[in-house]
Amino acid sequence: MRVYLLSCETVENGGGIYAYDLLEDGQLKRQGYFACDRPMYAVKCEKGLCVLLRQPFENDENSCYFYIDERLQNTTALQSTLGKVACHLTVDADDVYIVNYLSGNIVKNGEVIAQRTGKSIHPTRQTEPHTHFVNKTADGYFATCDLGTDTLAFYDKDLRLRSESKVPSGYGIRHLVFSNDGKYIYAVNELVPSVNIFAYRDGKAEYLNTVKIDCKNEKADGAAIRLSADGKYLYVSLRVENVICVYAVNGETLTLLQTADCGGNSPRDFDVRGNLLVCCNEKSNLITFFAISNGSLTKLDNELKLPSPLGILFG
């Protein structure tokens, strides 16, 4: 299967988009490379890939995005995200929705802006909104995590606010996944490592509970969250602690099965495909690979060195 790895560095330091064929044993065969400054995140779309660039361009403080074909050869012109430090996006047909972390907004097609307001209790990280995640729900709404205000918000396709739900103050909601039946949301918190559970229906989330993650390092923070294809297992990565936690999932109940060393430093992103988990360890410039059996992780011997790996996308 094809996998794209994003190196969030300048071109002169090896930054760009790397394409590999990933074999069942975790071995990689390089298939392509596109040089670009500081790619932050990417999603699949009809045009190939839609890619966020964190680096501002042409004396503009805003981030940019562009499209590129799956062979990493043909690109569109850069477009502004209309905000600072874009960090996540989703594509719906011809529409692209982007969140700008520092600007605290959600932007559709570089035109329509939904500006978040408010703050929470963390003295430095929550003095203003910080949108960190956006994705389309199965019923056509757009879910957004606002770390700065501890809020899970839902918008319609024109970015009109549908509903909001709060997580515990100071926890800093970051990313989320839905259960396979669409009835539950599992959202990782960054500032206090933990997972929120919500019941979901028709663009509205009901907060149910938060499961805290025991950490040895008080500076640990939550990063990425993924669900296995069968919906039975939830995976959560923690930076500083440098682990991936594995939970058995049963509706609103999470049961910790394993806490696995990520094999590197700062597992900012990872993804699961079949019986493999691929982890991007940002600060150790290292991609690590894990075999999955009954949900549990076993680290494989092969590794890949890559400068500042920030994102992974399966083709």
What is the meaning of each model-derived region?
Residues 73-135:
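Asp-box/WD-like beta-propeller blade repeats and closely related beta-sheet repeat scaffolds
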Residues 8-10, 54-56, 101-103, 147-149, ...:
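Short loop/turn segments immediately following the C-termini of beta-strands
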Residues 44-47, 91-93, 136-139, 180-182, ...:
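Residue-level detector of Asp-centered blade-edge/turn motifs that repeat once per structural unit
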Residues 13, 37-38, 85, 130, ...:
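Beta-rich catalytic cores
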Residues 220-281:
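Loop/turn-rich, solvent-exposed surfaces of beta-rich toroidal or solenoidal domains
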Residues 32-37, 78-82, 114-115, 123-127, ...:
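Surface loop/turn motifs at the tips and blade-to-blade linkers of beta-strand repeat domains
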